[in-house]
Amino acid sequence: MVTKWKKICLFDNYEISNTGKIRNSKSGKLLKFSMRKGYYCCSLSKNNTKKTFNVHRLVARIFINNPSKFNVVNHKDGNKLNNNSSNLEWTNYKHNANHAITNGLKKIFRKKIHQYDINGNYIDSFESINNAGLYTGINPKHISSTCLGKRKTCGGFIWEYDKKFSKEKKNGLPLENNNNYLITKDGRVFSKRANKYLKPKIDPDGYLLVSISTNNVNKQISIHRLVAMTYIENPNNYPYVNHIDNNKQNNNITNLEWCTPKQNMIHHIKTRTKIYTVKVAQYDMNYNVITSYASIKEAGEKTGIDKSSIVRVCKGKQKYAGKYIWSYIN
């Protein structure tokens, strides 16, 4: 895909690319993104006023037609950090939710529950809290609170989760020095107090975090380290945990390994070398195609232009290299 830049409407001091980068249109300097609910976001300034936008919505608004006037932007591959225009689509809330479920991005837990009278006599069972609410007319949120032990009764009844469900949910091993949490081999963290799996957050470096409370003090901890400390032996006391496939959100034990700082750096360098084997196109200053190369290494050798400079242009971190425009070819 050829990288294209366009002005951002109402904020013409900025340009956005179809690969999800934003830069100052005058200096060419790329903006740094922060994280908001798992999405990249950035602040744009105009007349001394700042406004924060989700990057994927800006890309969609500028590069993707929306004839049906949908108000939701969907990431096709489920990766919220992949804001390439080819990975985005306008949709509605229903399709967005179905997409998440179909692709395993969101799981539906049908928590079977049982209804009892005040004396503990069995009345009925329901496949889910929502079904119980529809049948009895009782607020599902209140039923949920009763099942979680936050209230004794709801609507004049006692409610409990099915015991089989509870056993299935509470799998995994306890965290080191904190038995209130369980961690599974695939990186899910279960809170015994809340009786549910914790929803992870994504830090600025792309790692998944959860908030762990110890002695009433909350601390954000990387999930990959929790998995490694619980399941993977570390006889040499190595300080780093490496993602073997370089996917920072794949926290399965089969994808993690303890390593030294040097080993971690070597792995990082090896994965970066893949960048130099991607096909690249060369353009003049008017975006006319000059030629293409099988790799950035070849482009650098034949043109005499620094390879890292070509990479920076392809990534949108600078405008030109050797008075040429460059872009990756997918």
From Swiss-Prot:
Gene3D superfamilies in the cross-refs: 3.90.75.20, Winged helix-like DNA-binding domain superfamily/Winged helix DNA-binding domain
Keyword Hydrolase: yes
Enzyme class (EC, first level): hydrolase
Protein name: Uncharacterized HNH endonuclease L245
EC code: 3.1.-.-
Protein source organism: Acanthamoeba polyphaga mimivirus (APMV)
InterPro entries for the chain: His-Me_finger_sf, HNH_nuc, Intron_nuc_1_rpt, NUMOD1, NUMOD4, WH-like_DNA-bd_sf
Alphabetized GO MF terms: endonuclease activity
Keywords: Endonuclease, Hydrolase, Nuclease
Top-level taxon: Viruses
SMART domains: HNHc, IENR1
Pfam families for the chain: HNH_3 (PF13392), NUMOD1 (PF07453), NUMOD4 (PF07463)
Keyword Acyltransferase included in the entry's annotation: no
